[in-house]
């Protein structure tokens, strides 16, 4: 069973070592060998991979990436399938995780020092750890739903059918942006990239997000995992985090009473650095 604790830190992202942002796109390769589109920040000796939330993109983790790069990490930021700038439509969390494992095998030596994910990205990270138990030395799993919500899944298609035609309208985009509590400077990329997501992909990844189930293989996970959840998240998210901590023997559960869904990745980058460095 994982350890538990409570923390209330808050800091701003470091502006050091921003460097040039590298982008990789796949060439003309067979479908079964399609590579994930990635952005890379930093040139440190240690490697971290961070997986963004559903409906967002790599910039979800820009604050964390800046801080990690300033502290000796090379940070790889994949774009999940079905999102703006990705190389293919969204199919499943399991397939995204398989692509991630292949990416780490092909380009990062088969193992990374740190693996993190938030929401949908956290589910992909968990699936990668289930598929390859020692793919990372440390992991941060933030706001991961691992208890299926069947009713929510059934409502995804009709909800998207109603809201999707409004995505490009500024008033709707601004309302959605405000509901997510994102930093103001992210509005432009948020609006641009949310408009680029197809209706089919939006339905697909929202359905997968609401139906993902905790995998028994995580009991053998070799990464030291920190599981983050906010007290202002829906109760099922807190229950998911606690179930995950029980399922992963070498994990630490940290519940932040006043935090919302995905807040650490956006507003508290130091939490990731501390977890990856093994600090309390």
Predicted ranges, named:
Residues 126, 130-166:
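Flexible "cap/lid" loop of the alpha/beta hydrolase fold
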Residues 221, 227-229:
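Short beta-strand/loop motif that positions the catalytic acidic residue
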Residues 232-236, 262:
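Acidic catalytic loop of the alpha/beta-hydrolase fold
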Residues 256-270:
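Catalytic histidine-centered segment of alpha/beta-hydrolase-like enzymes
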């Amino acid at each position: 069973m994982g350890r538990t604790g409570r923390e209330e830190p808050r800091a701003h992202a470091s502006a050091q070592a921003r460097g040039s942002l590298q982008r990789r796109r796949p060439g003309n390769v067979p479908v079964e060998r399609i590579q994930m589109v990635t952005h890379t920040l930093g040139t440190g000796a240690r490697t971290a991979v961070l997986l963004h939330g559903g409906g967002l993109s790599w910039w979800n983790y820009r604050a964390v990436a800046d801080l990690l790069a300033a502290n000796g990490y090379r940070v790889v930021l994949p774009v999940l399938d079905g999102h703006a700038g990705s190389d293919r439509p969204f199919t499943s969390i399991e397939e995204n995780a398989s692509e991630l494992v292949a990416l780490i095998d092909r380009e990062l030596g088969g193992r990374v020092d740190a693996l993190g994910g938030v929401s949908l990205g956290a589910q992909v990270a968990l699936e990668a750890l289930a598929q390859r138990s020692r793919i990372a030395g440390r992991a941060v799993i933030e706001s991961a739903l691992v208890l299926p919500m069947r009713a929510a899944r059934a409502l995804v298609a009709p909800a998207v059918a109603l809201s999707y035609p409004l995505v490009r309208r500024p008033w709707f985009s601004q309302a959605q942006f405000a509901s997510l509590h994102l930093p103001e400077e992210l509005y432009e990329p948020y609006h641009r990239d949310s408009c680029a997501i197809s209706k089919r992909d939006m339905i697909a990844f929202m359905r997968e997000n609401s139906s993902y189930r905790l995998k028994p293989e995580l009991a053998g996970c070799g990464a030291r995992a920190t599981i983050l959840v906010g007290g202002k998240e829906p109760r099922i998210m807190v229950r998911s985090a606690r179930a995950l901590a029980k399922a992963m023997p070498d994990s630490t559960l940290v519940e932040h009473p006043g935090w919302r869904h995905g807040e650490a990745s956006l507003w508290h980058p130091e939490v990731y650095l501390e977890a990856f460095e093994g600090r309390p």
